[in-house]
Amino acid sequence: IIETNNVIYAISTGSNFDLNTLKKAAKTNNFPIPKKNKKNFFQLKGARRLFPWQTPRRRNPRELHELIKDPDAAKKIIIPVDIFWGKSPDRQDHWVKLIFRDSWEGSSFLRNLLKVIFNGRQANVFFHKPLESEEIFTQKKSSSHLVLKTDRLLRARFRRNRQAKLGPDISNRRTLIHSILNSSSVKKEISNFSKGSKKVEAAQNKRAYKYALEICSDISYPVIYLYDKALNWFWNNRYDGLEIIGIEKISDLAVGNSLIYTPSHRSHIDYLALSFKLYTNNLMLPQIVAGKNLNLPVLGRILRNGGAFFMRRSFGANKLYSKVFFEHLRKLFQRGYSIEFFPEGGRTRTGRLLSPRPGIISMIIKSFQDMDERDVKFLPISITYEKVLEGKSYLRESKRRIKEKESIFSIFSTISDFRGYLGNAYLQFGEPIDCLLYTSPSPRDALT
């Protein structure tokens, strides 16, 4: 296909660096070289502005308008092309390269220049499945309508391809929060409570925004890179590694399914154990449900950057918080993310499993019940240790018969307790549970 004269390249960005990289790749592979005088390419965005805070112009390119008006337009083959700078986060060999790799965040000219400087030898050009012009010209519509249709088809194609490479886009936390606050359920709850009062409505909107900030994660790949280095040292120096059993089944399940990981909970390190192993096995990092008691100074930011989002122990009669939290779960499922939560609710102090708490399970089931695009699988996981980090604090609690309150000082005192060798650690995946088999009548009946 690409050797014919009917090829039109569609580039997702307006970057001249990307265009020149495509020209070089085309020349190397004896493909048609994109040239302005041949009118065989177009870019969906205008040129990047100089500074990061300036947004690029979204536009329908002049070349696309000319293509639509061409009498032979139906014979043309539009090939979407993506250019990614830098290797995936788990394969980067330097933190500077990681910072300037491609992500969902926008790029300025300066950032693009730095990407070329630090990742110039790691540029990857992807020629995607062609967009057949016959898909566009089957209906007799105006040229402006056909331009918009082509633009939408290409942007959807680029977004799917980018998600396959980078994972779902929740890097822009403000966008996620904005979508939660503008959801129909949150708006309806605010409207019902306000009863027409603009002053009350404004106050409720502020409350909802505060709740969303409190809940949402803020994944940072530079921080995850540091996690990887620190946890790799930890598991191999304080434990005799972290042995994983059954990971091979996860790779197949991750395709076309939303996965809900449900590990046992014996130690604070559980929050990062599963993510560490998924990361090292090139699987998507989950969003982790963490108790609000862990949203402490320093620690809360570290956990949030690793994918944790925070949940209050009890919602009580706070309907607005409940709506915001529920919508957050829905948005995560809609964007294709997996979830990790601890069914026991808290850490076991005795080593025995605690009875599961049905509240979060019920909310998770309810949040994906009306979504038909993906199947949902629960994955039970056992995380066991020969010795746990919190061994000494558990002994103190058993003697006093009082549970110690979480604080940043208690966390660091726990860390200071594990100077010695802690033995072996194991992470084992159980058999997946298909939610569709249990959620037909209603979530509550299924849980019972």
Regions found by a protein language model. Name each.
Residues 1-28, 160-260, 265-276, 300-307, ...:
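Membrane-anchoring hydrophobic helices of lipid-metabolizing enzymes
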Residues 2-3, 11-12, 19-20, 30-141, ...:
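A cross-family acyltransferase "interaction/gating" segment
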Residues 25, 41-44, 277-278:
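Short conserved beta-strand segments at catalytic cores or DNA/RNA-binding microdomains
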Residues 235-241, 288, 315-320:
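Short, flexible loop segments at the rims of nucleotide/cofactor-binding pockets, characterized by
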Residues 261-265, 282, 288-291:
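Non-catalytic terminal/interface segments that mediate subunit docking, oligomerization
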Residues 311-312:
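Short acidic-hydrophobic, aromatic-tinged amphipathic segments that line or gate anion-handling sites
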Residues 438-448:
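Single conserved hydrophobic/aromatic residue that forms the stacking wall/gate
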